[in-house]
């Protein structure tokens, strides 16, 4: 299973092509759109989300509500393109029009792709970098993740996400499965502990008032993953390694950990390894989940717990120092419309990125042309956990 996205932030649309989804998976546009809507929410979002509707159109790979096994194409229309038609149009323009073009960017933002991307691709107008490096592209990745979640749910694998920390205000690092899944989306900061939700909002408001931005930590949980997905044999097949790459590829994400994460460095081995037990009904299990559902790069049947660290968004309304690439003079960086805090929305993005990595790994482990074949193989693997 793989995918490709295309489109610019203020271009006409985002396009996704997903290859490798088995035939006969029931997919409805409204189910994908529910996930798209979650990404648009969250306290601290900017004005852009009031413009966009982010509803997807399925244009190939699905017939009468079921996948065909051929590539699936999804389209997300950028409603804001109506205001950018001249600036972001594909038709050639004259040199005079280019010189007088509005919204040209020559003052790169520290922490963004602007300057290095301009150097690498020889763009003198850094908007050519900004448009693709923008987090707008994550709308396409959520669409991919939504399809992945639909697939996983047919296998009784379920994903949830939450915010753990915003601007130094922290919730508990770990919750039990029921507490986690029964308390997502309770509030607009996506934190489980309601007592700190307002503190997080106040912190976001403070950053916005100061023209600044703040980051945080998000957590994703995947429940009921079958054992043995991934591999200890080769580095590139380790499931936690693949998830780590996927998570840090999300815009502004700077770190990833599993289970108790970096706290493992503070504890002795006797307190961080998860002891193995056996039950005749359910098979092998662990009473604890310090390692976040992984052993040796493989899923061990416990809930998979992924933590992602998001830095503050680099676009600031009180911009930092920069240099104009044309004059080489000191200037304040360009101000572009942005969020003061996107951590709640980023938790949704992270959930869908993890969903894709899990779906991809499952389909590699249990190669199947259609859903009945896949379901049967998953059932057999789960039985192995009892009979081995």
From Swiss-Prot:
**What is a biological process (GO) this protein takes part in?**
amino acid biosynthetic process
Keywords noted in UniProt: Amino-acid biosynthesis, Aromatic amino acid biosynthesis, FAD, Flavoprotein, FMN, Lyase, NADP
For the ligand (NADP(+)), the binding residues are: 39, 45
Q: Which domain of life is it from?
A: Bacteria
- What's a GO cellular component annotated to this UniProt protein? cytosol
Residues the record lists as binding FMN: 132-134, 251-252, 296, 311-315, 337
Query: Could you tell me which pathway this protein works in?
Result: Metabolic intermediate biosynthesis; chorismate biosynthesis; chorismate from D-erythrose 4-phosphate and phosphoenolpyruvate: step 7/7
Q: Which Gene3D superfamilies match?
A: Chorismate synthase AroC
| Entry's cofactor comment | Reduced FMN (FMNH(2)).
The answer to keyword Flavoprotein applying to this record is yes
Q: Which InterPro entries match?
A: Chorismate_synth, Chorismate_synth_AroC_sf, Chorismate_synthase_CS
The cofactors required by this protein are: FMNH2
Task: Say what the protein does.
Answer: This reaction introduces a second double bond into the aromatic ring system.
Its family remark reads:
Belongs to the chorismate synthase family.
PANTHER family per UniProt = CHORISMATE SYNTHASE
The subunit field of the Swiss-Prot or TrEMBL record says: Homotetramer.
The protein here is known as: Chorismate synthase
């Amino acid at each position: 299973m793989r995918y490709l996205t295309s489109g610019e932030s203020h271009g006409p649309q985002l396009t996704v092509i997903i290859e490798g989804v088995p035939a006969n998976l029931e997919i409805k546009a409204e189910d994908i759109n529910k996930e798209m809507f979650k990404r648009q929410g969250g306290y601290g979002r900017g004005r852009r989300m009031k413009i966009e509707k982010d509803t997807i159109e399925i244009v190939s790979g699905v017939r009468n509500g079921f996948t065909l096994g051929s590539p699936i194409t999804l389209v997300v229309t950028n409603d804001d393109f109506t205001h950018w038609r001249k600036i972001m149009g594909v038709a050639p323009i004259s040199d005079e029009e280019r010189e007088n073009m509005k919204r040209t960017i020559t003052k790169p933002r520290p922490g963004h792709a602007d300057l290095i991307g301009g150097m690498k691709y020889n763009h003198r107008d850094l908007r050519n970098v900004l448009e693709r490096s923008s987090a707008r592209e994550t709308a396409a990745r959520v669409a991919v993740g939504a399809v992945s979640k639909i697939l996983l749910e047919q296998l009784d694998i379920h994903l949830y996400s939450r915010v753990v920390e915003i601007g130094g205000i922290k919730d508990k690092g770990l919750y039990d499965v029921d507490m986690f899944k029964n308390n997502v989306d309770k509030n607009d900061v996506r934190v489980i502990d309601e007592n700190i939700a307002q503190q997080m909002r106040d912190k976001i408001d403070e950053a916005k008032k100061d023209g600044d931005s703040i980051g945080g930590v998000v957590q994703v949980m995947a429940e009921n993953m079958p054992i043995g997905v991934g591999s200890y044999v080769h580095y590139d097949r380790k499931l936690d390694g693949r998830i780590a790459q996927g998570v840090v590829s999300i815009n502004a994400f700077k770190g990833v950990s599993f289970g108790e994460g970096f706290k493992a460095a503070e504890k002795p081995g006797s307190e961080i390894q998860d002891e193995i037990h056996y039950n005749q009904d359910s098979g092998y299990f662990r009473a604890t989940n310090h390692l976040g559902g992984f052993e040796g790069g493989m899923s061990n049947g416990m809930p998979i717990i992924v933590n992602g660290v998001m830095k503050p968004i680099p676009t600031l309304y009180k911009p930092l120092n920069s240099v104009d690439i044309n004059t080489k003079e000191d200037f304040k960086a360009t101000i572009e419309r942005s969020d003061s805090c996107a951590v709640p929305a980023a938790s949704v993005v992270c959930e869908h990125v993890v969903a894709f990595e899990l779906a991809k790994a499952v389909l590699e482990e249990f190669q199947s042309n259609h859903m009945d074949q896949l379901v049967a193989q998953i059932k057999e693997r789960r039985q192995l956990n009892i009979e081995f």
